[in-house]
Swiss-Prot record:
Single GO MF descriptor: 4 iron, 4 sulfur cluster binding
Cofactors that this protein relies on: [4Fe-4S] cluster
The keyword Iron-sulfur is assigned to this record: yes
Cross-referenced InterPro entries: ThiC, ThiC-associated_dom, ThiC/Bza_core_dom, ThiC/BzaA/B
Keywords: 4Fe-4S, Iron, Iron-sulfur, Lyase, Metal-binding, S-adenosyl-L-methionine, Thiamine biosynthesis, Zinc
Source taxonomy: Bacteria, Pseudomonadati, Chlorobiota, Chlorobiia, Chlorobiales
Residues involved in substrate binding: N201, M230, Y259, H295, S315, R316, G317, D356, A357, L358, R359, E395, Y422
The protein's name in its UniProt record: Phosphomethylpyrimidine synthase
Length: 571
């Protein structure tokens, strides 16, 4: 697939270094423009005989990092998908919107006569949508020639094509969460044959945070590399908070609809009804939510198994449905009405993230009968959703020790027919409070190397409190490290290239390129500057750092030894 590229400069608020430039790659099938950050290196480095003086980087920040665009949060982002003229051609305006409270004058749309408007539907028909072409360009990062020459594990391979994207979506091995009512979205793909993605959770609680703070956290998460964001608000103004987040988000937004439904019954789980939940789905569908976490797999028969656990049910949605089932002495209405749920989702192209209500909340509960019993039900629901051509991913644990992680991936592939796996960690120990983001990244790296498609981030506040923007940044960056490490383990030539360039810059003592090739350039620059200042070398472009100093730097001595060897007589 050939692409054309246009360039703009990158604003200071997006990257603190002007080496970064916002660039766009244009499609050939549809009028799509795929945004990237191109890093202009201060030096030229040779990797496998190919010179690199710049590197295109996958970018999730959207218009927020384009200096030619002025973003007003009160107005939201431009509806870029509308310009592709695809959504309007396949949908009709909603006749009677459930909720008319909106930031924009755009009228919500839906399928006509209940037909499927999903990416899976079009993929099965052999239609390449704008979203499919977009993600193919995005995954390649304009490095097609590098991929051909340096494919997985050093074996030459072909770049990702729109046709390959289509085949993976058709088979259910990948999803493109893209509600037709989220026109501000820049499409992305979740599947084990693509880059490992990460999700950032935000959302207010009954005790803290405002709409402005949550919008800021959503944009902040995108700026640092979150591929999707989940709004898990449980406090006041849930609808308005979600509206502002959606209108300002270039990444897919997920929710857990049962939270808002619970708010409508004043927090009394026993009073929930299918009709109330259905109306909540419609409300969020019309707003543009791209995927719903739905805890339809926890059944009455699982509850006695959960009672035997050390930490019971730790999923909020799972505990709500368990309480409802016991109080009403009925089966989970999300399970009994699942086909009706699918009938709604397919009209808006909303993906379903089948929630793991029985994920283990402690090491002692990992891989137990309750967890895997629910996983089998999620596999049944996957088949049912695919019958309606609804895109599906499966949520996973949780707290799992390292030696038990691989079994989770194996059973998910077996029970859930290779649908994408999306895990919370797993956290590999129970004693890492205050450092659970690191705990989660350890397990996340391993399970992603086995084939998990997306990692849900954990912040330093996990188990302790509501994260602020600094926690969001740290959680995102740490899980970007995990995702990148897994991509390396899986043989990604694009992931490998960035590491090769970093190593070259490090050996050349090119500090600016080292900062910019890292996942957090401002922090690396700040740490280095502070340490050099403390050692009395402020502002120097030194061929050493304060870890070893000028006399004990191994790389410096290695270069000196090589230089001396090269000029020895007789050589």
């Amino acid at each position: 697939m050939s692409t054309n590229t246009t360039h703009t400069s990158c604003p200071k608020e997006s990257r603190e270094d002007r080496a970064f430039q916002k660039t766009y790659a244009e499609g050939t099938l549809w009028p799509v423009k795929v945004g990237m950050q191109t890093l202009n290196l201060s030096g030229t480095y040779s990797c496998n005989g190919v010179p690199f003086s710049s590197l295109p980087l996958y970018d999730t920040s959207g218009p927020h990092s384009d200096p030619s665009l002025q973003v007003n949060p009160a107005e939201g982002l431009a509806p870029v998908r509308d310009s592709w003229n695809f959504i309007k051609s396949i949908s009709v305006p909603c006749a009677a919107p459930v909720n008319t409270e909106s930031m924009t004058e755009r009228h919500p749309r839906m399928a006509e006569d209940g037909i499927a408007l999903t990416q899976m539907h079009f993929a099965r028909k052999g239609v390449i949508t704008p979203e499919m072409e977009y993600v193919a360009i995005r995954e390649n990062q304009q490095l097609e020639e590098w991929i051909r020459a340096n494919g997985r594990g050093g074996t030459p391979s072909e770049p990702i094509t729109a046709e390959f994207v289509m085949s993976e979506v058709a088979a259910g091995r990948a999803i493109i969460p893209a509600n037709i009512n989220h026109p501000e979205l820049e499409p992305m793909i979740i599947g084990r044959n693509f880059r490992v993605k990460i999700n950032a959770n935000i959302g207010n609680s009954a005790l803290s945070s405002s709409i402005a703070e949550e919008v800021e956290k959503a944009v902040w998460a995108c700026r640092w590399g979150a591929d999707t964001v989940m709004d898990l608000s449980t406090g006041a103004n849930i609808h308005k908070t979600r509206e502002w987040i959606l209108r300002n988000s270039p990444v897919p937004i997920g929710t857990v609809p049962i939270y808002q439904a619970l708010e409508k019954v004043n927090g009394v789980a026993e009073n929930l009804t299918w009709e109330l939940y259905r109306d909540t789905l419609l409300e969020q569908a019309e707003q543009g939510v791209d995927y719903f976490t739905i805890h339809a797999g926890i059944l009455e028969k699982h509850l006695p198994l959960a009672d035997k656990r050390r930490t019971g049910i730790v999923s909020r949605g799972g505990s709500i449905m368990a309480k409802w089932c016991r109080a009403n002495k009925q089966e989970n209405f999300l399970y009994t009405h699942f086909e009706e749920i699918c009938a709604i989702l397919k009209c808006y192209d909303i993906a379903v993230s089948l929630g793991d209500a029985l994920r283990p909340g402690s090491i002692s509960d990992a891989n137990d009968e309750a967890q895997f019993g629910e996983l089998k039900v999620l596999g049944e629901l996957t088949t049912l959703a695919w019958k309606h051509e609804v895109q599906v991913m499966i949520e996973g644990p949780g707290h799992v020790p390292l030696n038990m992680i691989e079994e989770n991936m194996q059973k998910q592939l077996e029970y859930c027919h290779e649908a994408p796996f999306y895990t919370l960690g797993p956290l590999v120990t129970d004693i890492a409070a205050g450092y659970d983001h690191v705990n989660s990244a350890i397990g996340g790296t391993l399970i992603a190397s086995y084939g998990c498609s997306m990692l849900c981030y954990v912040t330093p506040k996990e188990h302790l409190g509501l994260p602020d923007r600094n926690d969001v940044r740290e959680g995102v960056v740490v899980h970007k490290i995990a995702a990148h490490a897994a991509d390396l383990a899986k043989g990604s030539p694009i992931a490998r290239l960035r590491d090769e360039l970093m190593s070259s810059a490090r050996f050349a003592f090119n500090w600016e390129d080292q900062f910019n090739l890292s996942l957090d350039p401002p922090k690396t620059r700040e740490v280095h500057a502070a340490s050099m200042k403390a050692a009395g070398h402020e502002g120097e472009k030194a061929d050493f750092c304060t870890m070893c100093g000028p006399d004990f730097c191994s790389m410096k001595k290695s270069k000196e030894a090589s230089a001396a060897s090269a000029i020895e007589p007789g050589r």
